[in-house]
A protein has these predicted regions:
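Short acidic-aromatic active-site loops that bind/stabilize oxyanions
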Residues: 40, 58-65
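S-adenosylmethionine/decaboxylated-SAM
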Residues: 62, 66-244
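N-terminal beta-alpha supersecondary unit
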Residues: 54-55
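Intrinsic disorder
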Residues: 7-8
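N-terminal auxiliary segments of SAM/dcSAM-dependent transferases
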Residues: 11-44
């Protein structure tokens, strides 16, 4: 998915003025994605409500595509995750998909900076029947992550990062600190319409994405790969990593 996510650390001056970055989906990509969604993914009323309420609230349509949401759910289930950390809530679309993959005693903590986004997200999460499994932590994500490190909590089994790109590397560092060995880390928006090859296409967001990719390759406690994607959200991708 392309476009700016909620700025989760307002202390970063770049976050204050980040423009939306236009994604450029081709008609055949959109048609194929719709076919996959109808044939395999089968998004239900709860996730569709999250998209609808986000639009009604004037929020940007930058949630992951349905097939990516289903992938997150499957990754949660395949990894046997019981505790999920999400950085970037928006309207709760990804939150619902991942929450659906948790066992009944599972927990998901999601970080959101904007109160109005958190309000919409909570209504969607509760309507999906996940209110008892999900906790929204309001405020700058870096502050929330530092607070989580001070709390007496079990480490996380699954971390999904989909927030402001300038802080990607810092979010990855926190993922390693807060995740257990063997935990899965997913970082969204890793191709950014090719801006990783030409940072001039988006000089605000591209450097943070590139730095995060380099960190994924160099970090001694991360084993990672990157998958390119095309669809309604344009040409993009995600990184999939394991904490060693």
């Amino acid at each position: 998915m392309l476009g700016l996510r909620t700025c989760l650390d307002p202390r970063d001056a770049a976050c204050q003025t980040v423009p939306m970055f236009e994604h450029k989906p081709r008609p055949e990509w959109i048609a194929t994605e719709e076919f996959i969604s109808n044939a395999v993914v089968h998004p239900d009323a709860a996730v569709e409500q999250a998209i609808r309420t986000a639009a009604e609230a004037g929020m940007p349509a930058i949630e992951v595509a349905p097939n990516a949401g289903k992938l997150l759910k499957l990754l949660v289930q395949l990894s046997g995750a019981r505790r999920i950390l999400e950085i970037g809530t928006l309207a709760g679309y990804s939150t619902i998909w991942m929450g659906r993959g948790l066992p009944h005693n599972g927990k998901l903590v999601t970080c959101e900076y904007l109160p109005q986004h958190a309000e919409v997200a909570w209504a969607n999460i509760d309507a999906a029947g996940l209110g008892e499994r999900v906790e929204i932590r309001l405020g700058p994500a870096l502050d929330t992550l530092a607070a989580l490190a001070e709390e007496d909590r079990e480490p996380f089994d699954f971390i999904f990062i989909d927030a402001d790109k300038q802080n990607n590397s810092r979010y990855l560092d926190w993922a390693v600190r807060l995740g257990r060995p063997g935990a899965v880390v997913v970082l969204d928006n890793t191709i950014w319409e090719g801006a990783v090859l030409d940072p001039g296409l988006d000089p605000v967001n591209a450097p943070g994405i590139i730095d995060a990719l380099k960190l994924l390759g160099d970090h001694p406690k991360l084993d990672a790969t990157v998958i390119q994607t095309v669809g309604s959200k344009g040409w993009d991708g995600f990184a999939l990593a394991r904490i060693t």
